[in-house]
UniProtKB/Swiss-Prot annotation:
One of its GO terms (molecular function) is structural constituent of ribosome. Keywords: Ribonucleoprotein, Ribosomal protein, RNA-binding, rRNA-binding. It comes from the Bacteria. The keyword Cell cycle does not apply. Transmembrane segments: none annotated. Belongs to the universal ribosomal protein uL4 family. Residues 44-68 are annotated as: Disordered. One of the primary rRNA binding proteins, this protein initially binds near the 5'-end of the 23S rRNA. It is important during the early stages of 50S assembly. It makes multiple contacts with different domains of the 23S rRNA in the assembled 50S subunit and ribosome. Part of the 50S ribosomal subunit. Pfam families: Ribosomal_L4. It comes from Xanthomonas oryzae pv. oryzae (strain PXO99A). NCBIfam families: rplD_bact. One of its GO terms (cellular component) is ribosome. The gene is rplD. This is Large ribosomal subunit protein uL4.
Length: 201
């Protein structure tokens, strides 16, 4: 299949397996959730009644008309332990390489179908100027949250986009499903398209 390069009459031939794949919502959801879970610290820690510092001596006598109480480390007391205390754990989920790549292909294909994938000849700046980047993006009409994908990392481009909170810049090696799904428009260079195909084909 062929896709038009924005701003010219040229076309680029792309693999249908990468940019024309059927969209699987379940697959993409599973991979996105797994990717986000892998970024969780999982360091939350609370103490149970047996771990809280304090005496376990009975706090008051059994009889006398009041409620029956034992140790002050019980969960019902302030400063006592937590009933179902959270412990550090890993939230990581196993995702096969084949599944991950299939999900990336499905996302690219859906972006293409929805007209949210924009291919350009090149995307670079001569100097580190945020103003220049803003003007360039306005000319492309990419929406509020664009993702710019280049073949290799560009220092001028990265630094210019750094203080634009909704603009993301990635090279092909740094692509991930969350960035692709969250973008209004993905602006990708023709060279980056070829590199994506090499990675996913």
């Amino acid at each position: 299949m062929e896709l038009v390069i924005t701003g010219s009459n040229n076309k680029v031939s792309v693999s249908e397996a990468v940019f024309g794949r059927e969209f699987s919502e379940d697959l993409v959801h599973q991979v996105v959730v797994a990717y986000r879970n892998a970024g969780r610290a999982g360091t939350k820690a609370q103490k149970t009644r047996s771990e809280v510092a304090g005496t376990t001596k009975k706090s008051k006598k059994q009889k006398g008309g009041g409620a029956r109480h034992g140790a002050l480390t019980a969960p019902i007391f302030v400063g006592g332990g937590v009933t179902f205390a959270a412990k550090p754990r890993s939230f990581e989920q196993k995702v096969n390489r084949k599944m991950y790549r299939a999900a990336i292909c499905a996302i690219f294909s859906e972006l293409n179908r929805q007209g949210r994938l924009m291919i350009v000849d090149a995307f670079d700046l001569e100097a580190t100027k945020t103003k220049d980047l803003i003007e360039k993006l306005k000319g492309l009409d990419v929406g509020k949250r664009p993702l710019i994908v280049t073949e290799e990392a560009s220092e001028h481009l990265y630094l210019s986009a750094r203080n634009l909170p909704y603009v993301q810049v990635r090279d092909v090696q740094g692509l991930d499903p969350v960035a692709l799904v969250g973008a209004d428009t993905v602006v990708i260079t023709a060279d980056a398209v070829k590199k994506v195909e090499e990675w996913l084909a």
